[in-house]
Amino acid sequence: MPDANEVKPKKGWSNPALRMMGIPRISLPSRNWMIFWTVVTTIGGGIAYDKYEQKQMRKKWMDAVKQFGEVSYGANEIPRKLSIFIAPPPNDFLDESLKLFRKFIKPVLNAGVVDFEIFSESRQGDIRASVAEKIRELRRKQLVEETPKKNESNGNQDNDEEELKSRSDLYKAKDVLGLYKVFPADINVKSEDAIDDSSAGGIICVGRGAYKEYLSGVHEGLLGPLEKPQSVIDEETKLAEEKKKEKEENPDKDDDNDEEQSNLKPVPLRYIKPEDYANAQLAPELDLSTVVKDDKGVPVFFEQPVYTFPLPNLVGFTNIPRKIYRYFTKRFLVDDFGERTATIVNNKSRPFVYKDVLMAKEEEMDWPKKWVEKGKERNSEWVQELEHDERVTSRMKVFE
């Protein structure tokens, strides 16, 4: 009778030659090992397949615009240039937005030989304030050029003071060094954006928040006053005093992020509120009967087409299943963003219409609910409805 404690030999296949070489019997792994290797292989295979498809999708859209990269430019010519505004996702860091731009948008722009300049923000309102200030500077400059100088009107009769000029205005290095005589004259650099007003440059907003701030900044710059109103100054002073008082009452509440924010200048408040758009005058200093251009003959940024990329960013414990699905299907995101970027490189635009105010609106569905509620309490710019004035948007264009 066989012993109950006797272990039955494990089933498997064996070869005498292999046994003499010290190789044990070949058999299937245990049930637990089978489950482990099945899970590892499935997950690893899914990740590897998705990354392979990402490369294929990226290559497809890079090849779709490579004909633009084959265009040769002269020594005095520079290609088209975009302005890119990038904002961090709600309740997340700016690095997430920059990572998305580098992986999904930048390769197609590089393949199409499109130059770009990035403007990013670390706080809400930075993009809006920067855009509005650029337009105000343009208006101030135009106002100074149109206003005759007092010295010229008086014929400089009453001006007995010696007028000082910088050395660079009097002469340049090549005027005093004979070596520069062997070189040709100054190269007159021409931008591709100055050739055709309808296809000049372009604006890309990465994130619904960046688009809201850009559009609000354009309205503030064109419809708002040139100087900060007294009501805005009083409100900023009041907010600064409240913040200082709160900091004194709760000194232990400050963290590293608060210390970094306190070292920065506060974001300027709006010079004009959205409800006052209709009663405001549209940039009287600028000649809006034609396309407004800079000193180089390039249409200014608010005259250029605009496009917005939604930020597919999920946070929160309840969104973990959706995050897992998106992680294994990034190839669809690469394909979508590649197609959108190729449209921008192809440089086809149309007039701005009402529905374009809702560009990337689907991104707001992913915003954390608690963050949105907190933003409404603080009167955040991102959670407010985007107001617009037809006098401003009628001059704008969007990529199609």
Swiss-Prot record:
One GO term (biological process): protein transport
Biased composition (Acidic residues): 251-261
Topological region Mitochondrial intermembrane: 50-400
Topological type in the membrane: Single-pass membrane protein
Entry's localization field: Mitochondrion inner membrane
InterPro entries membership: Lipid_Phosphate_FormReg, Mt_import_IM_translocase_Tim54
Description of how the protein assembles with itself and partners: Component of the TIM22 complex, whose core is composed of TIM22 and TIM54, associated with the 70 kDa heterohexamer composed of TIM9 and TIM10 (or TIM8 and TIM13).
Family classification: Belongs to the TIM54 family.
Protein name in the entry: Mitochondrial import inner membrane translocase subunit TIM54
Gene source species: Candida albicans (strain SC5314 / ATCC MYA-2876)
Source taxonomy: Eukaryota, Fungi, Dikarya, Ascomycota, Saccharomycotina
Gene name, Swiss-Prot/TrEMBL: TIM54
